[in-house]
Amino acid sequence: MNMKTLLTYATLLSVTAFSHVVYADNQWPDLPTGFKDGVGAQVGSKVYVGLGSLGKSFYVLDLNALSKGWQKIADFTGAERSGATASVIGNYIYLFGGSGKAEPSDPSPILFDSVYRYDTKKDSWEKMNTTSPVGLLGASSYSPDNRQILFFGGYNKAYFDRYLRDISTTDKQVNPEVWQRIVDDYMGMTPTDYKWNRNVISYLPEKQEWRDLGVSTYLPNCGSATVIEGNKVTLISGEIKPGLRTAEVKQYEFGMDQPWKSLLPLPAPQTSNIQEGVAGAFSGKTNGVVVVAGGANFHGAKQAFENGKMFAHEGLPKAFNSEIYVEKEGIWSTVNSLPEGLAYGASFTTSEGVLIVGGEKSGKEMSHKVYMLAWNGSTVEVID
């Protein structure tokens, strides 16, 4: 990008409007290619993205050396995958879960239970001698103490592997009724029928040890936005079954006797009186407030579910949203919007704001754009 533009959007009343455009001193290099459904991790001043639409590729951007742009680093040594989760301990990035084909020739994808570690000093990958005890596709993770990694949510491996096998090995053209029945049976289950991971799971790399820290009082969900503050993590929205989101916001504080706390839910966007909830949203903190931006959902799914339809998103187009929400002192508000609807990219809290990278757009297009979101006290500046 030759010209970096600071786009400040006016607070919405009913439609989005640009307030003004000025030129920014900061320059946020765009990725060399589109990015979605991968992972992001932050080690010191460096942010990393990889997997998903990038295949086995990983890139790093040093926030203290922006002129170098995104640099390609060592390729991932495992199978390509989407929907994985990654967390950092020291100079290591640990990678878990995701879904893909173990071998390119395999008839169907699987949900991976393998664990990999990237050494940021040596620029090298290694496979750890362990497997996760629960499915971690779509799970959220963080390290509360720089020693262990905690996990929330995640698809059930046995159930999802069977669904992927059945749908991948059934010819839709030859057996359309059989194919549709497989979809209807899976998508028509209640949220609890999917048996997503409801426990808080801990992984201690130095001992290769997994522990169960207890059952969550909430429905398990996947694709949540996360905001990490020390030993606390805030889990924002996400899906409670395929196609159905929740507006719920909750916080987990590691080490407490009562670690869970309910927070106020996401408010409805200014264009609707219903908050469907979002999955794959961008999130972080800037100038003392929590920001949640973008995310995907199916408009109308919540009402269909409340009317008793379990396949709640049947026939509904997937919506990629542009709304930005701000939480200040426990209260949510809707403010301005992203330049376009985006979901399933990566986001990082930095000293200058929330850096968002890539994402899927409407029409299944992928974005290579990088923006900085900065709260100025009344609106979120979107710095290109």
Swiss-Prot record:
Record GO terms (molecular function): racemase and epimerase activity, acting on carbohydrates and derivatives
Subcellular localization: Periplasm
Gene3D superfamilies registered for this protein in UniProt: Kelch-type beta propeller
A Pfam family annotated for this UniProt entry: NANM
InterPro entries the record matches: Kelch-typ_b-propeller, NANM, NanM_proteobact
GO cellular component: periplasmic space
Keywords from the named record: Carbohydrate metabolism, Isomerase, Kelch repeat, Periplasm, Repeat, Signal
Function according to Swiss-Prot or TrEMBL: Converts alpha-N-acetylneuranimic acid (Neu5Ac) to the beta-anomer, accelerating the equilibrium between the alpha- and beta-anomers. Probably facilitates sialidase-negative bacteria to compete successfully for limited amounts of extracellular Neu5Ac, which is likely taken up in the beta-anomer. In addition, the rapid removal of sialic acid from solution might be advantageous to the bacterium to damp down host responses.
Subunit structure: Homodimer.
Protein name per its UniProtKB record: N-acetylneuraminate epimerase
Organism: Vibrio cholerae serotype O1 (strain ATCC 39315 / El Tor Inaba N16961)
